Amino acid sequence: MTDQENNNNISSNPFAALFGSLADAKQFAAIQKEQLKQQSDELPASPDDSDNSVSESLDEFDYSVAEISRSFRSQQEICEQLNINHMIQRIFLITLDNSDPSLKSGNGIPSRCVYLEEMAVDLEDQDWLDMNNVEQAVFTRLLLQDPGNHLINMTSSTTLNLSADRDAGEKHIFCYLYSCFQRAKEEITKVPENLLPFAVQCRNLTVSNTRTVLLTPEIYVDQNIHEQLVDLMVEAILGGHFESVAEFLDEVIEALILDEEVRTFPEVMIPVFDILSSRIKDLELCQILLYAYLDILLYFTKQKDMAKVFVDYIQPKDPSNGQMYQKTLLGVILNISCLLKTPGVIENHGYFLNPSRSSPQEIKVQEANIHQFMARYHEKIYQMLKNLLQLSPETKHCILSWLGNCLHANAGRTKIWANQMPEIFFQMYASDAFFLNLGAALLKLCQPFCKPRSSRLLTFNPTYCALKELNDEERKIKNVHMRGLDKETCLIPAVQEPKFPQNYNLVTENLVLTEYTLYLGFHRLHDQMVKINQNLHRLQVAWRDAQQSSSPAADNLREQFERLMTVYLSTKTAMTEPQMLQNCLNLQVSMAVLLVQLAIGNEGSQLMELTFPLPDGYSSLAYVPEFFADNLGDFLIFLRRFADDILETSADSLEHVLHFITIFTGSIERMKNPHLRAKLAEVLEAVMPHMDQTPNPLVSSVFHRKRVFCNFPYASHLAEALIKVFVDIEFTGDPHQFEQKFNYRRPMYPILKYMWGTDTYRESIKDLADYASKNLEAMNPPLFLRFLNLLMNDAIFLLDEAIQYLSKIKIQQIEKDRGEWDNLTPEARREKEAGLQMFGQLARFHNIMSNETIGTLAFLTSEIKSLFVHPFLAERIISMLNYFLQHLVGPKMGALKVKDFSEFDFKPQQLVSDICTIYLNLGDEENFCATVPKDGRSYSPTLFAQTVRVLKKINKPGNMIVAFSNLAERIKSLADLQQQEEETYADACDEFLDPIMSTLMSDPVVLPSSRVTVDRSTIARHLLSDQTDPFNRSPLTMDQIRPNTELKEKIQRWLAERKQQQKEQLE
């Protein structure tokens, strides 16, 4: 029988309608033939049916209706078998059937499949796939080195189908198995119920084969299995279908964990982490691919078993070497930022190159773009850490141990030498980027309890920081993973051992880890920013000077400036991502609340209201490291300098900061370190409104801060705290205290000025002055009296130093202009230039500070008079004012006429105006005017006449000039009268003269230890600065001195006698 006849017979068979195509029916017939043949081989031939056997009829291709009807005893089984074959072909895109595509219907079979030729030969006449041979078929398919060479058409369609070719001929076996998994999933949703178990079995087969591939990758030639896994995940993430891949991998991971005979699960997965580490380290912050890799790690850190492998994998080879943490996979991730990878090297740096060629708007756009990526990046790292903390106690312990050990190994970042030796620094410690990013992620972890009224916040236990060394098991039980905090200096010294709880909560650990990370990272970067700022200013000045003098160094200076500007913009951008700043502000405000609660002895879970006087019970501050308060101050100062808008938009929370400053600035009992308390004054300057921040400030830019500052309920205590720390930093015990105190006091002057302009603060300052006036001779000099004494000391020293430096600058400028430097050797000229620059910096600093001190005295004397005109202070302030006028308006003023006053912040007009204002404020007091002529060193009627001339020249208001002229006349009259009296008393004996001032004593007192007699006003002034006997250095207070009544009476009798004699002479 011919093929045509055979086909006709089958097509006319009514059962053929059960098949999808004529080819399917023919295939069924072949199956039956095979089965019957096997049966005939096993059973003896029967003479009754041998002539009519189906086998025989099939051999002869005699497909009559009767014969096929007898063969198809189980129609359902036959259809099922064919459908299983088609399903396997659709899932795995493989086949054993290479018959003519035109004989196949194309209905339910894929257009292209890989023909498994060797397997087809082995199975001889079986050209279909079933559940018995599918596992072998898939394994055979996986071993093909180039499956694309084995593709065949399954349908008669001649249309080019590249996607079908690509899918069936997929060379990467991991991707192939995932695709099979997806196709099996689809089959499960479509096949009839009777085929569902087989579809599920095929799906499981993809998982089991993937497990085998990962366990024994070496048997698959030219297949980098782990690379394929990573690529598959990346492609799925970028393509937006990662959930499907995750479902597949979940099952593969589960299968791997159940089968660790060949390889353990970590051994299988570590190569994946190796690949991720090598790829991530070369990526930049703004590359989309980076975020795909981070999403892969996010998936892994959600998987309990993968997360365990991850936390083991990131352990550094040497846990004591801080830099080694940066080389781990987590460290590689944390090291990515817009900061320079190698400090000072801008080559290959992708951000802010040639900034001078970019407009401010372009720089702003680039900054905003980087911030968008940073926010996304920090979120990924945060989610990763959060996953590890929440997944299991084991991963939580491991990641916290990693963080604690890392911070301990990098503790040296804060050492002074670390900034001075960068080449050693970067070999020993992890990078700035590492800690900035880690800090940003940890800040996010703290946000749930970073609310000022959070009850969770008060569960923080500071004794955590006092724990000594623990072993690993103890750390796990107690939840303590930071090391070495017991060696940190705390806010106050501990007087007793703390009571340690059984364990600590995550709030405590998170706060400590975050604060220490900020201390190692943000704090150090802020210092660098300030130095970069200073260097930029210096370069700008040098560049401008070089341009003006047509120096060949100009181009080099410009290049240096350009490079440093790139560093500055990159660093500023890295530190000012808005969400990170807001999170940090939330933390620091919460820390202010927490420290205030500890300072008032609150050990409960509910907030206590702040009341004055402060209650006792603040011993827990002895376990709070200073860096908690240092971070708070440092961050707020940073915001003031580089992100002031954050302060304004968060003004409502600043009241908590004011509480903190009020309590700690003035309380040595709660914060022993005077340097840290002085820093809080700078913090106060940072958070208070600055009306002069721009030439035309918008009221709204400080409106909210002004409201908070002016309505602060503890204004009087804040003003007192500020004045107290002003006084305290005079005696810090530091060998550099003299130089330091001026820097510490710099921010205090604008604060005092702002306070004086606000009613509540001004009244509280006046109350302090009134109290001082009434207690001038108290055992301990009143606070405000000591403050005024130090203020005048500063004014005298600073302006005198400024005058000296300006005189030197004047001389050097003249020498330079005359050409005297032209003949010097290059080295000598450089020394001269450096000297001039140094004098300029010193003059500028002293001028700024003297302007502030004199200005402060000017507004204070407007309403506080009694203290200034008291003999304790009057002579000192008068001699100071006259001395300065002598240099500013007298014949000596020519020595101060440097080229450019503004370059050195020299403001002689303002100084003259302020000095005259002080005179006019106090001039109504008769004893003050009477004291002016007693200044024999500087006062003269001519000096005041010269002052009037200068006031006219600088266009001061007419009423001021008239008032000062009248005052000058009054003082001149008193001077004439005093001169006559002095002539009368010129021959006073030494017993009547003050041994220190050599002036006639008016109120002699005896010092208890040295038994020396001095004038009361003289010793009172001395004790304001030094509470010792000036003659033997014994401790001395005003309440210990005794009046020398006998000597006082002798002096008064002698004065009366002299006056009487003078009167008689005149008559």
UniProtKB/Swiss-Prot annotation:
Reactions performed catalytically: S-ubiquitinyl-[E2 ubiquitin-conjugating enzyme]-L-cysteine + [acceptor protein]-L-lysine = [E2 ubiquitin-conjugating enzyme]-L-cysteine + N(6)-ubiquitinyl-[acceptor protein]-L-lysine
Q: Is-annotated flag, keyword Cytoplasm? A: yes
Chain positions with N6-acetyllysine modification:
386
- Source organism, top-level taxon: Eukaryota
Spans annotated as Disordered: 33-57
Tell me the route in metabolism or biology where this protein functions.
Protein modification; protein ubiquitination
In the Enzyme Commission scheme, what number(s) does this protein have? 2.3.2.27
Instruction: Report domain U-box positions.
Output: 987-1061
GO CC terms of this entry: cytoplasm; nucleus; ubiquitin ligase complex
Q: Which GO terms describe its biological process?
A: ERAD pathway; protein polyubiquitination; ubiquitin-dependent protein catabolic process
Domain description: The U-box domain is required for the ubiquitin protein ligase activity.
- UniProt-recorded name of the protein: Ubiquitin conjugation factor E4 A
| Organism of derivation | Bos taurus (Bovine)
